[in-house]
A protein has these predicted regions:
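Divalent metal-dependent catalytic cores for phosphoryl transfer on phosphate-bearing substrates
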Residues: 8-14, 38, 47-158
């Protein structure tokens, strides 16, 4: 599925407030990808590929955020998605895993880096790829965020 189609589909399935956040994450992710594409192994002529991956992950990162805790757990159970004890206690953390599952099954995303960026955008993990770090950071610093601790300083560092 092309990015324009993904954007259109995502917009149909999330709230307006969530969509504004999603656009902010995609925009911020694209800007960070432009800044860090060279460090990620992309060269001048193909850095737009990395920017497109960042935009795609940004638009899809919260595609399962609208599901209730019960729905997230049910999707995981039905599709054999592993759930940790921590996730059982705080099922909202599963929106990354379920979002990656939906990205693959509903939106046709097969790029492991994009899928991992969606999976770990809330929790992070050791050894994150540059794209994973970008989505994790973009979710925190996107323009619509106003109340995160040390936000101006973190934006400056990014």
């Amino acid at each position: 599925m092309e990015l324009d189609e993904i954007i259109s589909e995502v917009k149909k399935h999330i709230t307006e407030k969530r969509y504004v956040h999603t656009e902010g994450v995609a925009f911020t992710a694209a800007a960070l990808a432009m800044k860090f594409s060279y460090e990620s192994g992309y060269r001048e002529n193909d850095n737009m590929e990395f920017v497109d991956k960042a935009r795609t992950a940004g638009y899809l990162h919260d595609n399962a955020k609208c599901l209730s805790d019960e729905e997230l757990l049910a999707v995981c159970a039905k599709n054999n998605i592993p759930v940790t004890e921590c996730e059982k206690k705080s099922p909202y953390l599963l929106h990354g895993k379920v979002g990656a599952f939906y990205a693959k099954t509903l939106y046709g995303i097969d790029d492991e880096d994009i899928l991992n960026a969606i999976t770990y955008h809330t929790t992070g993990r050791p050894g994150m790829s540059m794209l994973e770090k970008i989505i994790f950071t973009a979710d925190y610093i996107e323009p619509g965020r106003t109340r995160q601790a040390n936000l101006d300083y973190i934006r400056y560092l990014a």
